[in-house]
């Protein structure tokens, strides 16, 4: 337990940040799952639309530091490859 005033403040800030990051992380996973669900359904139009919505969110989470920029690039690359494979 935090004893000093500054330690208590840091503990509160840390908890607030943790909850905020958990919310954003959940949102990110939700949008990625929507794209994957559309891909698994074989619906190219829906998958493309879902990917267009998810792509800036993935980029934003990388900018905010929630995920690494390479992980964001990997997400986008793999999802886009799966969408392109639907047409072929």
Curated annotation (Swiss-Prot):
UniProt GO cellular component terms: cytosol; small ribosomal subunit
Tagged with keyword rRNA-binding: yes
Bias (Basic residues): 1-21
Keyword Ribosomal protein appears in the UniProt entry: yes
Pfam families per UniProt: Ribosomal_S20p
GO molecular function, one term: small ribosomal subunit rRNA binding
Gene3D superfamilies associated with the record: Ribosomal protein S20
Domain of life: Bacteria
One annotated GO biological process: translation
PANTHER family recorded: 30S RIBOSOMAL PROTEIN S20, SMALL RIBOSOMAL SUBUNIT PROTEIN BS20C
Function noted in UniProt: Binds directly to 16S ribosomal RNA.
Family to which the UniProt record says this protein belongs: Belongs to the bacterial ribosomal protein bS20 family.
Protein name per UniProt: Small ribosomal subunit protein bS20
Gene name of the record: rpsT
């Amino acid at each position: 337990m935090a004893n000093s005033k500054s330690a208590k403040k840091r503990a509160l800030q840390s908890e607030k940040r943790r909850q905020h990051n958990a919310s954003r992380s959940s949102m990110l996973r939700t949008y990625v799952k929507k794209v994957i669900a559309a891909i698994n359904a074989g619906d190219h139009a829906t998958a493309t639309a879902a990917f267009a919505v998810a792509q800036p969110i993935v980029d934003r989470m990388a900018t905010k530091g929630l995920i690494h920029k390479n992980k964001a690039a990997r997400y986008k690359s793999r999802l886009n490859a799966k969408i392109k494979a639907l047409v072929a």
